[in-house]
């Protein structure tokens, strides 16, 4: 039996540009997507072993209310049916079906022992579970896949469900460190970033609802070709304007300009609200905006923004120092 841990991921800058960059395969005028992402300390802990079927179990107290143990025969037909069902285990079954189809593996039994990652909060809980399943098959059946291979399989498995997340989510495969990711059509490049000073990030689950599938569906409609000015501005926001933001963020991190980095977060959120939020009713996020503008929080932070696909999922701040970070968390 093997013990595994897969972290969630926090997108610091560049949300939605992963799938937008993929449209370069159909429209060369679209710029590559660029995002700065990092794994976080919260994640999924599990024990895995070989089995005859594909099984998911959980002992995690955090999931006891939503969890029902799952078992499926290790056949392409059964696994693909679950993947398309929209059920709680559709993501896991999507990855398992891909592994069976391309690597002719047997089954696995995955027992989640601890879950410190909130669900549906923009921290890639679905991607983390996909990476966990891919890694379990990889290690148990000695497939010799590297981290990028696990990440790609997690993405392709998730594509077998009704979800249409981009490749950015699977950055959790790289562990707890900041990376610059570039998405050029079907190609992905990952570069580790230099961070000169300690950055005191704080992120929080807003404990409200968000509809990621609706958000992604609405934002994908103006691609690959924009038809009006609003759609052109969406292309710019996820393209050239995002490139400038990423360039500044990388510079501020490398030079230790923490205050400027926080201000850039707020600037980025304002751009998102002006040009991206109007493209989907599901992006209206009253709780997020209330928290970002809370006068009690402002003296403790340099800036803040939404997380992941946005909406009322989670919020992230760059605290001024360790003491301010602790006050925010408390």
Predicted regions and their residues:
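Secondary-structure boundary elements
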Residues: 99-106, 139-145, 255
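C-terminal nucleotide
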Residues: 1-35, 41-90, 97-101, 152-162, ...
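DPxDG-like acidic metal-binding loop motif
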Residues: 122-146
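Glycine- and acidic-rich phosphate- and metal-coordinating loops
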Residues: 96-97, 101-121
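Active-site pocket scaffolds in enzymes
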Residues: 312
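Beta-strand segments within the central parallel beta-sheet cores of soluble alpha/beta enzyme folds
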Residues: 108-113, 145-157, 263-264
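Short glycine/threonine-rich catalytic loop with a Thr-x-Gly-x-Asp
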Residues: 123-125, 304-307
